[in-house]
C-alpha cells in the first residue's frame, strides 16, 4: 500500500512529513507532562528521531507525483519539499545544541522542544501554502512559537527584552502583511487561493501596488531585510543561542519560500515593480549588514548583522527571477544552513565553557581547544565566501545567476560587500589563533577541559562534526546539489518554466496550472 496515495479529496499524503512532526510534538508533550525525570531525559532523542523521520518522509515524497492537500491550500511540489527539508534540518540541529544549553541554564527543556516543533510545523506549512488563510495561519504558528522561544530563559533580562521587541515588531509586520492580504482578497472578489488572485491584479492600479507594498513589508520582516531588520541584532543578542540558530536559518528559509511562491504566483503582472523594490532592498541589506558588522564586539551580534547581509545576497537570486536565480537561491540556503548553524554550535559551546561571547575573549582559543577553533574558523571563512568551501560556490552561483539576468549593479555590490565580510570573519579567526601565551584572554586561560560524556555534550559534538563536514564537502559536491535545486525549480509548475509544464502529467492541480500559466519572464533570455 502506498502511504503517499491520495486520501479522499484532501490528498492527505501530501502532508505526511507534517503529520510526523505533529505526532512527535504530541508525544513529547505527553511524556513531559506525565513522565518522570528519567522519561524526560529522552525528550531530546524523541524530538530528534521525529524530525529525522520527517526528513525521511520528505525524501520519499520526492519520488512521488506531486500532490495538493486541504482542497488546494497546500502544495507538495519539489520546491516546497526542499524548503520544508531545510526547516526540519535546522530544527534537528537546534535540538542537538539545545539540550546542554538549557540544562546548564537551569531551564526546563520539555516546553522548549514543544515550541520548537510547533515553529517547525508552522515553517513547513508556510513553505507549501497556496492559500491566503493557510499562509496567515502558518505565519502566526511560526511567529508566536518564535516569540515564546526568544523569551524562554525568563531569568535572563536580556531574553525577556528580546522577546518583547520581537513580539512588538512581529505583530506590527503581521498587521501590515494582513492588510495587504485583505486588499488582495477584496480586489479578487473574495478569492483566497493565490493562483486565483493573480488574474484580478492585471488592471488593479494603485490599490494593487499598495497591496504589493504591504505584502513586501511583511515578507521583508521575515527575511530581516533592510529597513525591516531593526529587531534582528537585539533579538539575536538577547535570545538563547539555540533559538537564534533556528531563527537565522529555519525562519528565514520559510520566509524565502513564502516570498518565491507569493510573488511568482500572485504578482506576475507586477514583476517589474517587485523586482525593482527588492533590488533596492537587496543593496541596502548587503551594505548595511556587512558594514555595521565590522564594528561589533560580540560574536552573536556580529552574526546577527552577518545574517542580515547574507539575506541581501540571497535576494539576488529572487530578483533575478530566472530558473538559475531560484536554483541558486535554494542552493545557497542549503550551504548557509551548514555554515551558519555550525558557527552557532561553536558559539554555544564556547559560551557554555566561559559564559561570554565577546570576540576578544576568543583570543588564543587555538591553544586550549583546537577542535572548536577549527570548526568555527571553517564556518566563518565559508560565510565569507573563501574557496574551496561551500559558501564560495553558493555566492558564485548567486552572482552568476544575477549577472546572466542583467542585475549587474546587484552583483557588483555583492562582490564588494563580500570582500568587506571577509575582513570581519578573518578578524575573529585571527583572534583565535594567536600564538603568544601573553595574548591569551582571561576566559581562555581559565578554559576548562571539555567533558564530552556529560549530558547533552555528545549531541553537541555530533552537530559540530556534521556541520563541519557539510561545510567542507558541500563545496566539493556543489554540482549535484545545484542540479537538485535546478530540478526542483524545473518541476514546480507555479514558477512557470517550460519543463515544469511537462512534469508529472495529470498530477498537477488546476490551481498550480493557473499559476504556471502566469509565468515570470526570464530576464536572461
Swiss-Prot record:
Catalytic reaction equation(s): a plastoquinone + NADH + (n+1) H(+)(in) = a plastoquinol + NAD(+) + n H(+)(out); a plastoquinone + NADPH + (n+1) H(+)(in) = a plastoquinol + NADP(+) + n H(+)(out)
EC number(s) from the headed UniProt entry: 7.1.1.-
Localization in the cell: Cellular thylakoid membrane
Keyword check for Thylakoid: yes
EC class of the enzyme, as a word: translocase
Regions that span the bilayer: 14-34, 42-62, 78-98, 117-137, 167-187, 201-221, 240-260, 276-296, 302-322, 330-350, 374-394, 396-416, 462-482, 494-514
Molecular-function annotations in GO: NADH dehydrogenase (ubiquinone) activity; quinone binding
Keyword tags: Membrane, NAD, NADP, Plastoquinone, Quinone, Thylakoid, Translocase, Transmembrane, Transmembrane helix, Transport
Assembly notes: NDH-1 can be composed of about 15 different subunits; different subcomplexes with different compositions have been identified which probably have different functions.
Entry similarity comment: Belongs to the complex I subunit 2 family.
UniProt-recorded name of the protein: NAD(P)H-quinone oxidoreductase subunit 2
Organism: Synechococcus sp. (strain JA-3-3Ab)
